[in-house]
From Swiss-Prot:
Similarity remark: Belongs to the bacterial ribosomal protein bL9 family.
Pfam family, one: Ribosomal_L9_N
GO molecular function: rRNA binding; structural constituent of ribosome
Cross-referenced HAMAP family: Ribosomal_bL9 (MF_00503)
GO biological process assignments: translation
PANTHER family: 50S RIBOSOMAL PROTEIN L9
Record's function text: Binds to the 23S rRNA.
Identification of the protein by name: Large ribosomal subunit protein bL9
Length: 148
């Protein structure tokens, strides 16, 4: 019996593979537990259509991330913090503040967990901040920390 694996099965194969198995193993275990479907022409056609749809969605998502990367490269986010008597900042600039200011001033939404601060932004100045957008696409955002 031929089956289309829906999930990875240890010792048999990965999801999406078509395997030849014994009838009892295929019907009772793989199909019964939801690890596979019988490899009928209709099931294979549905699987191929789903794979094409996923590929198109991935292509669209990557194009949107590339567009966002280009937009972020053109933008400088200004974050104003209170200065102490000696000219240093009270605290440091957080990921949340950067994400909020980016959304408020430039209407670009980036999750705070995507912002990668290598060092704490504790002084006034211009910084390059890395943003991990996903699918191995990284953007660089300029952050200008100013005192008030």
């Amino acid at each position: 019996m031929k089956v289309l694996l829906i999930k990875d099965v240890k010792g048999l194969g990965k999801a999406g593979e078509i395997k030849e198995v014994k009838d009892g193993y295929g019907n009772n275990f793989l199909i019964g537990k939801g690890f596979a479907k019988a490899a009928t022409p209709d099931v294979l056609r549905q699987y191929e259509a789903a794979q094409k749809r996923k590929a198109e969605e991935l292509k669209y998502e990557i194009a949107n991330l590339e567009k966002l990367k280009e937009e972020l490269a053109k933008v400088t986010v200004v974050v104003k913090k209170t200065l102490g008597a000696n000219g240093s900042l009270f605290g440091s600039v957080s990921k949340e503040e950067i994400a909020a200011e980016l959304e408020k001033t430039h209407h670009l939404v980036v999750e705070k967990k995507a912002i990668d601060l290598d060092t704490h932004l504790k002084a006034v100045g211009l910084y390059d901040v890395s943003i991990k957008l996903g699918h191995s696409i990284n953007a660089t955002l300029k952050v200008d920390v100013q005192g008030e």
